[in-house]
Amino acid sequence: MAENQYYGTGRRKSSAARVFIKPGSGNIVINKRSLEEYFGRPTSCMVVKQPLELVDMVEKLDLYITVKGGGISGQAGAIRHGITRALMEYDESLRPVLRAAGYVTRDARRVERKKVGLRKARRRPQFSKR
């Protein structure tokens, strides 16, 4: 592995992302595709770029990302978490800024399981008085 490469693992829902950061020109590659090509929707692209915009390093770092599992939203969240961790490895002084924005904390919310006798996790069958 290169000397000036920094790594972070991010997770969200059932997605896991591995993020490699190195000094560069702001090139973001996700699963061998560009950011805009991988995430069609602008919302997901915005979520991915949030930690970089916060510390003003969008044009200063190149990112190589592999992500597996889950859907679009979960993958975007996992990538954001991974980028945050890699940035903290790159420069520890960024931690308080990223912490204040809420990017350091792993979002532990998961899909609640379906229960027996119910239609969904909490949705009960329709009640009939007679």
Curated annotation (Swiss-Prot):
Superkingdom of source: Bacteria
Protein name, per record: Small ribosomal subunit protein uS9
Gene that this sequence comes from: rpsI
Gene Ontology MF terms: RNA binding; structural constituent of ribosome
Organism, scientific name: Vibrio cholerae serotype O1 (strain ATCC 39315 / El Tor Inaba N16961)
InterPro entries: Ribosomal_Su5_D2-typ_SF, Ribosomal_uS9, Ribosomal_uS9_bac/plastid, Ribosomal_uS9_CS, Ribsml_uS5_D2-typ_fold_subgr
PANTHER family noted in UniProt: RIBOSOMAL PROTEIN S9, SMALL RIBOSOMAL SUBUNIT PROTEIN US9M
Cross-referenced HAMAP family: Ribosomal_uS9_B
GO biological process: translation
